[in-house]
Amino acid sequence: YEIGVRLVGSGMCIRDRPCLDSIEKISEWLEQVFIKLNLKNLILIGHSQGCLEILEYTYKYKSRLKKLVFVGGSNKMPVHPDLIELAQNGDSDAVKLMMKWGYEGSKKFIGGNPVEKIIQSPRDISEILAVDLNACNNYSNGLNAAKKIEVPSMLIFGELDKMVNLESGKKFSDLIKNSNTHIIKGCGHMIMIEKAFEMREKILEF
């Protein structure tokens, strides 16, 4: 089975419940989901913040895991204070800056900026994006968690990504014992949108 998990507070759920405000809380919530669905031998795939989430999940609940795939992520993801401030104020410039840092050629996306289509209002920016940025910035257990990974792991990075550059990616991969790395050329941070077919092919090979 392939399951895409929508986190509490994401998307339309913001009207019902607030976002989980830490990586630790998200990992605990994921475990409750997997218990409810009675899932074992998991292959977890995370992108960006999702990499921190599966890192922390692995640290706490490794018995459920079979493999891990980290896409455009690292063991730590500090966020510039100016970006956090813009997001907390609901400023749309926060989304524009994210796309600029993630991929300089973001204007080349057919149909426009994909992040702007997901995060559409000042409320989305202040109540979803700002919470997630703070969660990433405050997470501090990534180094320890990465060193304790025991299952086979794949790391996929975008050559042009400035949010998680290749230097950071190499440092992350060096922490994980049983891992291999794939770099997608001509690609920024939004790997699953920019180079969906190549990413999917590499994951299936893994």
Which residue ranges define each predicted feature?
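Single conserved hydrophobic/aromatic residue that forms the stacking wall/gate
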Residues: 1-9, 14
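Conserved acidic catalytic loop of the alpha/beta-hydrolase fold
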Residues: 25-42
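Conserved alpha/beta-hydrolase "nucleophile elbow" surrounding the catalytic nucleophile
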Residues: 42, 46-48, 158
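Flexible "cap/lid" loop of the alpha/beta hydrolase fold
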Residues: 52-96
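Conserved alpha/beta-hydrolase catalytic His-Asp/Glu region
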Residues: 85-150
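Short beta-strand/loop motif that positions the catalytic acidic residue
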Residues: 149, 155-157, 161
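Short alpha-helix in the alpha/beta-hydrolase fold that links the catalytic acid
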Residues: 151, 165-174
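Catalytic histidine-centered segment of alpha/beta-hydrolase-like enzymes
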Residues: 187-200
